[in-house]
Amino acid sequence: MKIVVMGDSDTVVGFRLAGVHEAYEYDESLESVERARNKLRELLERDDVGIILITERLAQRIGSLPEVKFPIILQIPDKFGSIYGEDILRDVVRRAIGVELKR
């Protein structure tokens, strides 16, 4: 199964260096966001893709992400950090493993 990353150039370069199988770079233009939307649809149809990593900012621009069981779609922060903040992450961890994270 392949891991694919979609996002800004800095994020994509980092994941390429880490050995991700496929990486797709997009900017903030409407044309680029439409290309990303089409690429996401294409990736969802492929049997060889197991995980799609997409930056939170790109996911926000694409709009609602499809709710599918497979491949797994994970939103990741970009170089500017998470747009959702720590509260969302804390809630996800609490629901996933039943442990409350405190600072």
Curated annotation (Swiss-Prot):
Presence of keyword Cell membrane: yes
Tell me the disulfide pairings in this chain. none
Q: Name one Pfam family in it.
A: ATP-synt_F
- Gene3D superfamilies documented for this protein: ATPase, V1 complex, subunit F
What subcellular compartments does it reside in? Cell membrane
Answer whether the UniProt record assigns the keyword Transport to this protein: yes
Instruction: Classify the main location.
Output: membrane
The Swiss-Prot or TrEMBL record describes its family as follows:
Belongs to the V-ATPase F subunit family.
Any idea what this protein is called? A-type ATP synthase subunit F
